[in-house]
């Protein structure tokens, strides 16, 4: 059996909760062959792994979201081709941009077609006309040139994802929705394999929170970006055979974002019972008690309106993205 793990922005490039979980999971099944399809920003991190890869992880494929047209490993300047869509392809690409119901199979087939250039499509007349139609219907009160280039920026990483040649496997296990979920959904379309999605955090909500706080994107463009992530997650939920989350509240969020409830399994983080022996438990309780003693109120050191004298204990926190 061959399992393809699809990850974004984590394993094996950075240490963190999700990365550690992936590494442990692969090691826990030495009789299963794993391959890794990992999504990163650009080629600057190519092959820079911080984990020693397990022996049963046989191949690593990298997808770069901030990429350009490459041939035989080198960038070449070419005369731009006039790229035209079929009527069906144009209809579905319009539905994609307009946030309508999408026949994703047509989109998948379009980008896996031989000779399709992401640059030529984004800069071509069909995409221009689709964006202009969207602009006239929904965003006519903003500057068109800004809108056009923003839409090109939004769809560039998605189009690169859709052009990726997905390796064949028996099961695709995405550790998030987003671009990873798009790859998993496309793999299921072409290889007729099973698709499992395990969400440690709710990808769409995390991206939404980042965008709301971000300074690099303003006004209505925040909503356009948020809708982009929502439609990618909806695709993943629709195509997945099983979707897992860590707690009931996350399940409700997944349902709210369009995941069929019958697909969802709540799987809380496990506990290694070997570490919960009576001896270890007693030792842990003693440590907790000593820590509490540090913070206890010291007699004779209090005055009206003052705080108890305390030692400041700092904790190193690690944040794991997606």
Predicted regions and their residues:
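N-terminal subdomain of nucleotide-sugar transferases
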Residues: 1-131, 135
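Active-site proximal beta-strand in glycosyltransferases
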Residues: 3, 171, 188-215
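Short N-terminal targeting/anchoring amphipathic segment
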Residues: 97, 163-181, 190-196, 200
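An amphipathic, basic-hydrophobic alpha-helix
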Residues: 147-171, 181-183, 231
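Membrane-proximal helix-turn-helix segments that form the acceptor-binding/catalytic region
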Residues: 158-168, 190, 202-203, 220-243
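Carbohydrate-associated surface elements
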Residues: 249, 270
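Acidic anion/phosphate-binding donor-loop and adjacent secondary structure
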Residues: 255, 262, 271-288, 292-297, ...
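Short donor-sugar binding/catalytic loops of nucleotide-sugar-dependent glycosyltransferases
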Residues: 292-298, 305, 314-320
